[in-house]
């Protein structure tokens, strides 16, 4: 449970992580501002308070929340694809991660948060409103259906996907939503290196790049082997993908 007088160490952990991120090339100036850290702390308070009545997250200790939700969400700060993106879709956002921390940092970019679980997404919408984030929209929809929707298909400059599934599956969820020339950031652990080989066919069929850039961020999350797997989109996704709801997870490419 979140306590209003949470130990100062929680804020210190957050400030230390934000200071590391602020040193990155192309990191926005706002990341070093007190008001941004205040926004993240308020987001944590909102999540943990609501988590007492609705299951939003299994991470309930504030120190772990700072590390595994807030700082982990911000691992992509300073990367060129994020810097140039204007429209971003967060696939399987749940209660708003990584979308909300990034939307608060980049108010000039538009974020669409999608999820198949209505209650979590309703909370994300509530949190966005509470935090004054007018650059966030939410949509209750399965990823497969979103990828076949003409208003969403190949619309976004960047797709984010965190803690949703294995690479062969989530590649089919995300690549159809991204325009040619765009990219997908998959938040994974280095244990996913085996999944990378398994997802080669999916990338080939869906228009993704053969080469995948992997960025470790152990400096941001000491002791955690987390990484971003970055896939560029080189070609248009064939009309046959994504397949119908439930098929990608049952029969991965």
Model-derived regions: residue spans:
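Residue-level signal for inorganic ion chemistry
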Residues: 47, 102, 124, 188, ...
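Conserved SAM/SAH cofactor-binding pocket of Class I
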Residues: 63, 74-165, 171
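Helix-to-beta-strand junctions that scaffold the AdoMet/dcAdoMet cofactor pocket
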Residues: 106, 178-180
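Short "lid" loop at the C-terminus of a central beta-strand within the Rossmann-like core
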Residues: 144, 189-194
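SAM/dcSAM-binding transferase cores
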Residues: 200-253
């Amino acid at each position: 449970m979140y306590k209003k007088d949470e130990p100062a160490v929680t804020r210190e952990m957050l400030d230390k992580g934000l200071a590391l991120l602020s040193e990155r090339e192309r990191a926005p100036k706002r990341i070093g501002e007190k008001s941004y850290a205040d926004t993240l702390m308020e987001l944590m308070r909102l999540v943990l308070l609501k988590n007492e009545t609705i299951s939003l997250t299994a991470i309930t200790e504030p120190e772990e929340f700072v590390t595994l939700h807030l700082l982990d969400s911000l691992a992509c700060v300073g990367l060129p694809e994020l810097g140039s993106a204007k429209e971003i879709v967060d696939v399987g956002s749940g209660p708003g991660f990584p979308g909300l921390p990034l939307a608060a940092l980049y108010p000039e970019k538009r974020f669409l948060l999608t999820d198949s679980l209505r209650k979590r997404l309703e909370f994300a919408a509530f949190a966005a409103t509470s935090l004054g984030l007018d650059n966030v929209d939410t949509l209750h929809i399965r990823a497969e259906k979103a990828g076949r929707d003409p208003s969403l298909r190949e619309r976004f400059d960047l797709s984010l996907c965190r803690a949703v599934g294995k690479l062969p599956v989530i590649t089919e969820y995300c690549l159809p939503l991204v325009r040619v020339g765009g990219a997908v950031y998959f938040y994974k652990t280095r244990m996913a290196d085996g999944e990378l080989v398994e997802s080669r066919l999916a990338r080939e069929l869906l228009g993704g790049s053969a080469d995948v850039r992997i960025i470790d961020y152990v400096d941001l999350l000491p002791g955690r082997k987390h990484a971003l797997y970055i896939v560029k989109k080189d070609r248009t996704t064939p009309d046959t993908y994504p397949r119908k709801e439930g098929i990608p997870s049952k029969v991965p490419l």
